[in-house]
């Protein structure tokens, strides 16, 4: 079950909210049991084959914390951490390791047929955070019910945001959240619709442009301009897809009176790669900083150690994202550019902000192309074809992916025949303009002040109905497989 499905929006979420607040009137304890039950159902519905591993992981980690609280033994801490890492590596990287061995040693070891538990990268990191914070004395002992809710809370279990244990557990103990809040409900509904718009209207449309290029399969068959536009399309796709999901996750929690942390802060406004990582997937950056970078010494042990720690963090980030050398190289390159930013920080003041932004944005685009590529060789091939500038022609196939049934209706309603007939690629231009305007001209949805009035209600209601009519076959979120 994903946020952009009818069953979630029109059945699961309304029933969950209604049931939670009705049960809260009688018992906060039973309301938490209800919340745990619906969260477990949500996960099982999304990926039943991996459900038992989630349960095993929860039971093992909770027992580790109980033992650690009583014995305060660092060995138990490491047993818990190693268990989580081994579980993650077993499911996510076993076949990658086999393929690598086969390539290097010319072997033919068969691949395993295991099913990757959905969201394992996220719920594994969440539980490592809980174990470490418990060892550090930052957490009180919590009931198994609270722990289950912390790990499985349905708005964030599949793709985050990653939440600090204290942030969420404190809210589970706050009985003031038992009553429905009209402000939270309005904020949540409006934020959810914004996230849904990002995913269904923007991300899924840009995804069609990206899929068009990869469907052709050979970048020699398309022009340099095509490759550049597809690269830019993926930059927009991954942002609107993942930030749209985060908006819907935060909104779903808000309607239940829970606050999840902001995950994006207009990342494409960044003036450097370091600035980008303060704005992109913020919850992952905070996790890697607190649980890896700082324990390694952070920036307090000299420049060489700082650069080494930075590279370790970005290498782990790359590995965490996926089992492919493309992700590993993507992480390494982000680490190198982050170190470069540190080295030239004093000189950057002399460079015009517009040039800083442009250099950063182009770098991010090139690295996203690597993120999307099936292999490093494919990425290099795409880059070389793009940088040859052999043709500025835009293929009709690429232009046509932006002409949708919905755009035809808009053309008819607003009489846009002149523009559509005289501007080649009119709708592609519109989508790219919307992408830039939303990324660079608007504040983050998390920071937006939502209004309660009739006009706003009508606008969001109409927008929601329009989006519902645009949902075709279920499209998977980009980070769903991470």
What does each of the following model-derived ranges do?
Residues 1-435, 439, 447-481:
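Membrane-embedded transmembrane alpha-helical bundles that form the catalytic cores
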């Amino acid at each position: 079950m994903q946020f952009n499905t009818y069953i979630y929006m029109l059945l699961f979420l309304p029933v969950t909210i209604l049931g939670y607040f009705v049960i809260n009137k009688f018992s906060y304890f039973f309301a938490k049991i209800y919340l745990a039950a619906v969260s477990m159902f949500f996960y099982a519905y999304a990926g039943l084959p991996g459900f038992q591993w989630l349960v095993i992981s929860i039971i093992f980690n909770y027992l580790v914390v109980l033992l650690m609280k009583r014995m305060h033994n660092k060995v138990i801490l490491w047993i818990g951490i190693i268990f989580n890492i081994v579980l993650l590596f077993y499911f996510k990287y076993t076949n990658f390791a086999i393929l690598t061995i086969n390539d290097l040693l010319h072997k033919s070891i068969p691949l395993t047929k295991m099913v990757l538990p959905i969201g394992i990268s996220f719920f594994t990191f969440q539980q490592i955070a809980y174990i470490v914070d418990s060892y550090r004395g930052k957490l009180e002992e919590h009931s198994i019910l609270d722990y289950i809710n912390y790990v499985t809370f349905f708005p964030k279990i599949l793709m985050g945001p990653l939440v600090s244990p204290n942030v969420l557990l404190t809210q589970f103990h706050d009985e003031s959240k038992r009553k429905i809040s009209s402000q939270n409900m309005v904020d949540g509904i409006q934020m959810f619709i914004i996230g849904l718009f990002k995913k269904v209207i923007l991300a899924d449309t840009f995804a069609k442009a990206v899929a068009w290029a990869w469907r052709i399969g050979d970048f020699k068959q398309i022009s340099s301009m095509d490759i550049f536009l597809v690269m830019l399309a993926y930059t927009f796709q991954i942002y609107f897809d993942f930030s749209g999901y985060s908006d819907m996750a935060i909104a779903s929690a808000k309607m239940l009176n829970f606050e999840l942390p902001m995950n994006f802060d207009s990342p494409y406004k960044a003036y450097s790669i370091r600035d980008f990582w303060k704005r992109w997937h913020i919850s992952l950056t905070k996790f890697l900083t607190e649980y890896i970078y700082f324990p390694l010494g952070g920036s307090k042990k000299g420049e060489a150690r700082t650069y080494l720690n930075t590279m370790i963090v970005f290498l782990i980030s790359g590995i965490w994202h996926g089992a492919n050398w493309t992700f590993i190289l993507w992480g390494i390159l982000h680490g190198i550019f982050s170190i470069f930013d540190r080295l030239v920080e004093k000189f950057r003041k002399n460079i015009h902000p517009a040039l800083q932004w442009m250099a950063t944005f182009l770098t991010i685009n090139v690295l996203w192309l690597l993120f999307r590529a099936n292999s490093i060789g494919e990425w290099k091939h795409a880059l070389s074809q793009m940088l040859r500038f052999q043709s500025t022609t835009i293929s009709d196939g690429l232009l046509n992916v932006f002409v949708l049934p919905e755009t035809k209706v808009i053309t008819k309603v607003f009489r846009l025949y002149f523009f559509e007939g005289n501007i080649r690629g009119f709708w592609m231009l519109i989508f790219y303009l919307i992408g830039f305007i939303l990324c660079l001209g608007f504040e983050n949805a998390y920071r937006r002040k939502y209004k309660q009035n009739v006009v706003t209600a009508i606008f969001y209601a109409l927008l929601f109905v329009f989006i519902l009519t645009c949902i075709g076959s279920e499209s998977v979120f980009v980070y769903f497989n991470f």
